[in-house]
Swiss-Prot record:
It comes from the Eukaryota. Belongs to the UTP23/FCF1 family. FCF1 subfamily. One of its GO terms (molecular function) is RNA endonuclease activity. SUPFAM superfamilies: PIN domain-like. InterPro entries: Fcf1/Utp23, Fcf1_PIN, PIN-like_dom_sf, PIN_dom. The gene is fcf1. Residues 65-164 form the PINc domain. The keyword Lyase does not apply. This is rRNA-processing protein fcf1. GO terms for cellular component: nucleolus; nucleus; small-subunit processome. Its main location: nucleus. It is found in: Nucleus, Nucleolus. One of its GO terms (biological process) is endonucleolytic cleavage to generate mature 5'-end of SSU-rRNA from (SSU-rRNA, 5.8S rRNA, LSU-rRNA).
Amino acid sequence: MGKAKTTRKFAQVKRVINLKDQRLQKKDQKKEKEKTTKNGELVREIPQMASNLFFQFNESLGPPYHVIIDTNFINFCLQQKIDLFEGLMTCLYAKTIPCISDCVMAELEKLGIRYRIALRIAKDERFERLPCTHKGTYADDCIVQRVMQHKCYLVATNDKNLKQRIRKIPGIPILSVANHKIRVERLVDVVD
């Protein structure tokens, strides 16, 4: 039996909605209403929030943004299949310079073979290496210390403890990976 014959029989057995049915027209009308604004004009573009309002509490932040990257952030980007450089650019709408401290590199090397891809990404030439003068310090302590000294950095991490420590420092934005996207945590409205 040919395909045309079976489709005719299907239409006879099952009730098929006609294309001119009112139920389908109501859905189309709802879609058209969503496209228009209150004034009846078409929405052609959505205004973008000015970046200077977002970073109003920290005047040393500005493009190109220097982003200190933690070990967790690289691993989560790999798990979520996000390109680190493109993700940062699309998130911040500006040129970004990802920075990795020597402590983070040492932490990646200690993790061993399982995290060799993350180590290979961290050794990329596009990353700016931040030399550490201290010896044998925990990577989170190194990041917090560097951010407290120079408030020109954004911090990219998924570590809950590090996020809590950085939230106590006013004016430092935190980037994290969630739902296959890199997101910026909202800055505190009032700085003490």
